Amino acid sequence: MTIIRKKHPLIKIINHSFIDLPAPSNISSWWNFGSLLGLCLAIQILTGLFLAMHYTSDTATAFSSVTHICRDVNYGWLIRYMHANGASMFFICLFLHVGRGVYYGSYNMIETWNMGIILLFAVMATAFMGYVLPWGQMSFWGATVITNLLSAIPYIGTTLVEWIWGGFSVDKATLTRFFAFHFILPFIITALVLVHLLFLHETGSNNPTGLNSDADKIPFHPYYTIKDLLGVLVLLTVFMILTLFFPDILGDPDNYTPANPLTTPPHIKPEWYFLFAYAILRSIPNKLGGVLALILSILILALMPLLHTSKQRALTFRPITQTMYWILVADLLVLTWIGGQPVEYPFIIIGQTASVTYFAIIMILMPIAGMIENNILDLD
C-alpha cells in the first residue's frame, strides 16, 4: 500500500497534499476552516446539481419550478434548504478563514493570499447570481439594483448594464445567463482552490506563533485528518440544525412572493453575508464613489501585505494591534446590522461612521500600532 501511495503518479499527488504533508505541530482549530470550506463547496456542488435537474431558468416558470422542487420532488425541500443554508455556512467559514489569515499574518504568503481574494470574489459572484434564480421579489429587485451599479462607470456604464441584462431590464435573458454562470462558476472555483493549495504547499502553513516551523513538523495524516474530522462533525451538526429546524431564518420573506417589476419591496437588501459591503456602498452619497468603496471593501485585503509594518508576523504577541483587530470585527458586525436597516436617521450616520472606521483601522491604525509595538519592544 505504501509503495502505491508514494509511487503511483496520481495517488502520490494526493499523498503529498493530504497524507505525508509536513504540517506545523502547533496549528489550532482556526486552521480547520480550509477543509470545512472544501466540504461546503462539495455540498453546494452536489445539492446544486440535483436542483439544476428540476429547475427551469425561464421567467414564466422559474418560481413555479422551485415550488415544484419543494412540494413534489423526493426530498426536494431538503436539497433546496441545504443549498440555501449551505451558502450561509460557506460564508461563515469564509469570513472566519479570512479573519484567521488577517490575525495570524497569513497574508505574507502573497500568492496564496491573492488567490484567496480571487476565490472570495468568485464565491460572492456565484452567491449573488444564485440568489436571483428563485425569481422572487428580492431576487428580481436585488438583481436590478446591484447590476444597475455598473451604470456608474463613466462612458460605458449604461451600455455595460444593458449588455449584462441582455435587454433594457432584468428579464428572461438575464435569468438564463445567470443560471449558466451560476452553474459553471463552482467548477471554476474548484480549479482555483487547487491553485490556492498549490501555492500554500510551496511555502507550508503558517502557525499561531507566526514563527518559522520548519524545525518542528508532523505528518498531516493522522493528526490533522482526525482534527479536521471534529470540525466537520461540528459544522454538519450546526448545518443540519439550521436546515431542519430554522430553514428560513436567514432568508427574506419577500422572496416567497413571485417577482413583479411593477411593485418594489419596501426594503431592498441582499443576503446577510453581503450586508457589510452593502452598508459601505450606501454610506457614500455619490453612486460611483459608493461602487468604488464597495469593491475596495474586499480589495483592501490585497493591500494588507503592503500595510504590514510590524517585525512580527502574527498578532499573538501584539496587544495594541489585537485591540484594533477586535474593534474591526465589531465594526463589521455593526456594518452587517446597518446594511439590513432602512436608509433613515440614525442608521445613515452610524453606517457612515462604521464605514470610515473600517478603512481607517486597516489603512491607518493597524500599521501605526505595528510601528508603536516595534518601538516598545526595540525591534527596529
Swiss-Prot record:
InterPro entries: Cyt_b/b6_C, Cyt_b/b6_C_sf, Cyt_b/b6_N, Cytb/b6-like_sf, Cytochrome_b, Cytochrome_b_C_euk/bac, Cytochrome_b_N_euk/bac, Di-haem_cyt_TM. It comes from the Eukaryota. Heme b b566 binds at H97, H196. It is found in: Mitochondrion inner membrane. The keyword Methyltransferase does not apply. Keywords: Electron transport, Heme, Iron, Membrane, Metal-binding, Mitochondrion, Mitochondrion inner membrane, Respiratory chain, Transmembrane, Transmembrane helix, Transport, Ubiquinone. Disulfide bonds: none annotated. The chain crosses the membrane at residues 33-53, 77-98, 113-133, 178-198, 226-246, 288-308, 320-340, 347-367. Changing T237M: In strain: Isolate 2. GO terms for biological process: mitochondrial electron transport, ubiquinol to cytochrome c. GO terms for cellular component: mitochondrial inner membrane; respiratory chain complex III. Its cofactor is heme b. Heme b b562 binds at H83, H182. A ubiquinone binds at H201. Pfam families: Cytochrom_B_C, Cytochrome_B. Signal peptide: none annotated. Binds 2 heme b groups non-covalently. Heme 1 (or BL or b562) is low-potential and absorbs at about 562 nm, and heme 2 (or BH or b566) is high-potential and absorbs at about 566 nm. The cytochrome bc1 complex contains 11 subunits: 3 respiratory subunits (MT-CYB, CYC1 and UQCRFS1), 2 core proteins (UQCRC1 and UQCRC2) and 6 low-molecular weight proteins (UQCRH/QCR6, UQCRB/QCR7, UQCRQ/QCR8, UQCR10/QCR9, UQCR11/QCR10 and a cleavage product of UQCRFS1). This cytochrome bc1 complex then forms a dimer. Component of the ubiquinol-cytochrome c reductase complex (complex III or cytochrome b-c1 complex) that is part of the mitochondrial respiratory chain. The b-c1 complex mediates electron transfer from ubiquinol to cytochrome c. Contributes to the generation of a proton gradient across the mitochondrial membrane that is then used for ATP synthesis. Belongs to the cytochrome b family. PANTHER family: CYTOCHROME B. This is Cytochrome b.
